[in-house]
A protein has these predicted regions:
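Hydrophobic alpha-helical segments and helix pairs
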Residues: 86-160
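Juxtamembrane boundary at the C-terminal end of a transmembrane helix
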Residues: 272-286
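Internal active-site segments that recognize and position negatively charged phosphoryl groups
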Residues: 145-196
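Transmembrane alpha-helical insertion/packing segments
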Residues: 1-63, 104-111, 200
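Hydrophobic alpha-helical transmembrane segments and adjacent short intramembrane/lumenal linkers
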Residues: 199-267, 271-272
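Hydrophobic alpha-helical membrane-insertion segments
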Residues: 95-112, 179-186, 220-223, 266-268
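Alpha-helical transmembrane segments and their helix-start/interface "positive-inside/aromatic belt" motifs
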Residues: 7-20, 42-50, 82-99, 256-264
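Membrane-helix interface/capping segments
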Residues: 65-84
Length: 286
């Protein structure tokens, strides 16, 4: 029913509209998991994954429509500047969708006070920031723990850890979007939920502190997720290009070169985001 009420074509003329779609889909996902699975002794343990899966199901029509449209436009572009110009609206639409996910996940998680809703995301956060003390970290940063922000790793080690994790996500996004274009939304929705969990930790689960938490994580989060979106777009475009033209067609070669250009841009952005996260953001939020 949702895909009938909300037409993906509307996102073409106003990428900002995707913000409200992200808010709606993430909110519905949280509420469904909280009320349908919150009391289940087995499924409640996997609430963090189920929330993301619901978001993925809701978002697939938009992702497929955008990938299809972008591949058709990509066939005629050859320059790097031209590649950015024709794809920037799609990237902006993804970023607005991502922001909607983050705000809905963060607010919903804090208001519902269900520690299982983003349980896997909290563990992921701890695995990145405190790899040697994951269990202690999870206990500390849950609703029942005392949320005290600490930096468990030295900057150099943390930079390598974060950059390695980010490039791993980037490769996974590329492969996932190539195999099943719209499937890359899983990686993107998952990252939105992890950032939401991190914002909850940073704000000590206080609604009034959410704007500060958003600033804290969006300084590096927006360029980072933009790199993932560009990668997802590249994989989706390549997948559709193979289906439409095969691998021997001249149009496919043009599409392939543009995809390589997009991945190069994404890689540069990802390195910059890691530098900001490790060396710049801590100076503002000590």
């Amino acid at each position: 029913m949702l895909e009938s009420l909300i037409n993906p074509k509307r996102a073409e003329k106003g990428p900002w509209k995707m913000f409200f779609i992200g808010l709606l889909y993430a909110s519905i996902s949280l509420l469904m998991v909280h009320f349908l699975f919150g009391g289940d002794p087995v499924l409640s343990k996997f609430s963090g994954l189920i929330v993301v899966l619901f978001c993925v199901m809701f978002s697939i029509p938009f992702m497929y429509f955008i990938f299809k449209q972008e591949e058709m436009e990509d066939e005629e572009m050859e320059s790097l500047l031209g590649v950015w110009r024709i794809h920037k609206d799609a990237i902006y639409a993804f970023l607005w969708l991502f922001l909607g996910f983050i705000i809905a996940f963060t607010v919903g998680y804090i208001l519902l006070k269900d520690p299982n809703l983003l349980n896997a995301q909290i563990e992921t956060y701890c695995n990145i920031n405190s790899p040697g003390q994951v269990n202690d970290c999870v206990a500390q940063y849950s609703f029942t723990g005392n949320t005290i922000s600490t930096n468990a790793l030295e900057n150099g080690t943390r930079f390598v850890s974060i950059l390695g994790n980010n490039f791993g996500v980037m490769i996974f996004t590329l492969v996932f979007s190539l195999i099943f274009g719209a499937g890359a939304i899983f990686v993107l929705a998952w990252n939105a939920s992890v950032i939401s969990a991190a914002i909850g930790i940073f704000t000590s689960y206080k609604i009034s502190e959410i704007p500060l938490g958003l600033i804290r994580y969006m300084i590096h989060g927006f360029p980072e997720i933009a790199a993932y979106f560009i990668t997802a777009l590249a994989g989706g475009i390549l997948g559709v290009g193979v289906i439409r033209h095969g691998i021997g067609n001249k149009k496919f070669v043009r599409v392939l070169l543009n995809v390589i250009a997009l991945i190069f841009i994404a890689s540069i952005i990802l390195v910059g985001a890691a530098v900001i996260e490790v060396y710049f953001t801590p100076l503002l939020f000590q």
